[in-house]
Design a protein with these regions (language model features):
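Patatin-like phospholipase
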Residues: 1-20, 28-190
């Protein structure tokens, strides 16, 4: 957000945005027309602890569940799947994360990303093939979620039969994606 503030201060035009991971979140919010002040309010009100938490805040738990805090280290998804033991796909499923991402997206519903106020692309990684997946359309919140799914921490996002994780694995700085969008000058932020 800080870089965007400086670009606005010096009136540097932003013709397109390509983002990965946290860059996909900030990029999508800005590309969809959210002002930096609006972003600051939403991002400032987010507790990182709650963002990546799957259970309600402690004060909302019954006394019995509160005592579990002292006896249970974590509660991963464990179960049987076709007779085989299966484990969760990440420490968190990303449900809370998706809620916040929907707040950060001014564009609701399905979009061609070239039709946003600023053309936008997000990069995720196909967990099966190991290749980059560049999103040119979709629901912004879902696309941001896929691009931010850190393997092992947040469960992969499922899209069109693919399991997608954080784009940083294949395109930490999606400069080539920005060039393919027509950018002559690229300002890359890591």
């Amino acid at each position: 957000v800080g870089v965007l503030k400086v670009l606005e201060e010096y009136r540097v035009p932003v013709d397109c945005i390509a983002g990965t991971s946290m860059g996909s979140l900030v990029g999508a919010a800005y590309a969809s027309g959210m002002t930096l002040d609006e972003m600051d309010v939403i991002l400032g009100s987010i507790s990182t602890e709650l963002l990546f938490r799957e259970t309600p805040p402690r004060q909302e738990l019954a006394l019995r569940r509160k005592t579990d805090d002292y006896t249970i280290l974590s509660t991963p998804e464990v179960g049987l799947d076709n007779g085989s033991l299966s484990f969760g796909k990440g420490i968190v499923t990303g449900v809370q994360l998706e809620t916040v991402l929907r707040q950060l997206s001014k564009a609701k519903g399905f979009y061609e990303f070239d039709e946003l106020p600023i053309p936008y692309r997000a990069v995720a990684t196909d967990l099966v093939t190991g290749k980059a997946v560049v999103f040119k359309e979709g629901e912004l919140a879902n696309v941001m979620r896929a691009s931010m799914s850190v393997p092992g921490a947040v469960a992969p996002a499922e899209f069109d039969g693919m399991l997608l994780v954080d784009g940083m694995l294949t395109s930490n700085l999606p400069v080539q994606t920005a060039r393919e969008m027509g950018a002559d000058v690229v300002i890359a932020v890591n």
